[in-house]
């Protein structure tokens, strides 16, 4: 089952979304327009960007959404 969670700023504006697969624990980060920003693979314990480049060890999908919003402003 896929769980979709909106990521909001302090004022309640939706910045993006994170989809989590209940079975595998993998996550996909989307911006407000549903463009894929990156993916977290639980088995590898790493977060990759849209192009597949490793960004960090651990789950930093929420940071991808926030960083994209910061660049837009």
Regions found by a protein language model. Name each.
Residues 1-73:
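Intrinsically disordered, low-complexity proline/glycine-rich segments
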């Amino acid at each position: 089952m896929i769980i979709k969670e909106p990521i909001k700023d302090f004022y309640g504006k939706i910045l993006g979304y994170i989809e989590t697969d209940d079975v595998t624990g993998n996550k996909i980060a989307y911006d407000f327009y549903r463009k894929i920003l990156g993916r977290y693979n639980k088995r590898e314990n790493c977060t990759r960007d849209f192009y597949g480049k490793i960004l960090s060890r651990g789950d930093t999908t929420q940071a991808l959404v926030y960083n994209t919003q910061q660049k837009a402003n």
